[in-house]
């Protein structure tokens, strides 16, 4: 039974649940891209899928809106996939396990992919509807936004005529946001010299930091939440003032835009 079947608007949550059932991690979006193409073809809509996997779907204007400017609805099909250590899931082959608690939707011990699955769901609901008046629509769903906006950077626009674009990737329903969050990725290589441990009676210990709030770097970065990597670094520095220690390995984080918790 569908977990979100009773939520309104039904069409939006129907498509969101379908999307959640299809693996769509960044750089692994072929299945969701093909799903969008099949959706369009089943409804005899114009569709173009490029070599990157970006999908463009067009729907003609409804009666009375033929002369209105063309509007683009834009979102991305990929999601950030993260899980707790005790969750067994293969993001490349399995969909998400959805949980509905009151009016809150979350996934069982994984990220949900509401960013930006809800945009795709809204767009599909509008494309499928016969009772929503609208101008001519161009729905542009890109790949690999979460790892550098690679799909948007590589898409060609020869067949796009939209005068207005609505990017469906903000956080607050009912509000229009003018602006965006930027991002920068840096790769640092630090030369190190390995040395043998010369302590008399060394004891190997493992330290871990978890249970923090985490969050999305595009929204929560300004809230000054604790970062597990930084917290661990400060802890090691404090220990170093009181004990003779050697660092064997430090490891933390898998996604650039997921605040380490």
What kind of region is each of these model predictions?
Residues 65-147, 152-163:
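Active-site metal-coordination/substrate-binding segment of hydrolases
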Residues 36, 120-127, 232-236:
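Buried hydrophobic packing segments
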Residues 33, 116-120, 229:
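Short alpha-helical patches at coil-to-helix transitions and adjacent helical residues
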Residues 20, 40, 44, 81, ...:
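Structural signal for hydrophobic packing residues in well-ordered secondary-structure cores
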Residues 23, 94-97, 101-106, 110, ...:
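Midchain, well-structured core segments that form catalytic/ion-binding scaffolds
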Residues 27, 134-136, 242-244:
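Short secondary-structure junction motifs
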Residues 2-103:
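Acidic/His- and Gly-rich active-site-bordering loop/insert found
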């Amino acid at each position: 039974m569908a977990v979100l079947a009773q939520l309104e608007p039904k069409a939006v949550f129907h498509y969101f649940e379908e999307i959640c059932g299809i693996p769509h991690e960044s750089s692994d979006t072929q299945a969701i891209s093909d799903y969008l193409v099949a959706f369009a073809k089943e409804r005899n809509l114009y569709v173009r899928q490029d070599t990157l996997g970006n999908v463009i779907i067009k729907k003609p204007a409804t009666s009375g809106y033929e002369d209105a400017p063309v509007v683009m609805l834009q979102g991305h099909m990929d999601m950030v996939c993260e899980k707790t250590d005790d969750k067994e899931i293969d993001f490349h082959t399995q969909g998400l396990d959805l949980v509905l608690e009151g009016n809150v939707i979350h996934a069982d011990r994984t990220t949900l992919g509401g960013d930006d699955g809800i945009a795709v769901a809204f767009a599909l609901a509008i494309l499928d509807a016969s009772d929503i008046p609208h101008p001519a629509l161009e729905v542009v769903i890109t790949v690999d936004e979460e790892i550098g906006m690679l799909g948007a950077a590589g898409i060609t626009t020869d067949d796009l005529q939209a005068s207005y674009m609505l990017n469906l990737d903000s956080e607050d329903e009912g509000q229009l946001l003018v602006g965006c969050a930027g991002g920068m990725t840096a790769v640092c290589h630090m030369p190190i010299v390995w040395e043998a441990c010369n302590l008399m009676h060394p004891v190997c210990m493992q330290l871990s930091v978890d249970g923090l709030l985490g969050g999305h770097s595009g929204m929560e970065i300004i809230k000054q939440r604790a970062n597990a990597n930084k917290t661990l670094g400060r802890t090691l520095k404090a220990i170093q003032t009181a004990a003779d220690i050697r660092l064997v390995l430090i490891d933390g984080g898998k996604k650039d835009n997921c605040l380490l918790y």
